[in-house]
From Swiss-Prot:
Keyword field: Ribonucleoprotein, Ribosomal protein
Keyword Repeat: no
Entry's Gene Ontology molecular function annotations: structural constituent of ribosome
Pfam families reported in the protein's UniProt record: Ribosomal_L31e (PF01198)
InterPro entries, per the entry: Ribosomal_eL31, Ribosomal_eL31_CS, Ribosomal_eL31_dom_sf
Record-given protein name: Large ribosomal subunit protein eL31
Top-level division of the source organism's lineage: Archaea
SMART domains: Ribosomal_L31e
GO cellular component: cytosolic large ribosomal subunit
SUPFAM superfamilies listed in its UniProt record: Ribosomal protein L31e
Length: 93
């Protein structure tokens, strides 16, 4: 996580986020909805506000890799929560 010091970390977790529900929306909205689902999942599980969740570029690239109509069914994300409540998420290796 660039920009924050390791001393400020409160919680670090790796999540597998299911995105099957995204298949129920119209095809041209799926990748955009998947981004919202990832953000919403992190808000629920890291107990913070949506404005404080920062998604890394690699998550966005993974969700849009096959186009807007075919996002992946699940995604593994490494999320770090800092003392000020900010959550930074990146694609897990």
């Amino acid at each position: 996580m660039v920009g924050k010091m390791a001393d400020d970390m409160v919680k670090e977790q790796i999540y597998t986020i299911p995105l099957r529900e995204v298949r129920k929306v119209p095809a041209w909205k799926r990748a955009g909805r998947a981004v919202k689902e990832v953000r919403g999942f992190l808000v629920r599980h890291m107990k913070t506000e949506a404005e404080q969740v920062k998604l890394d570029k690699t998550i966005n690239e993974c969700l849009w890799e096959k186009g807007c109509e075919k996002p992946p069914l699940s995604i593994r994300v490494r999320a770090v929560k800092f003392a000020d409540g900010e959550v930074q998420a990146e694609l897990a290796q």
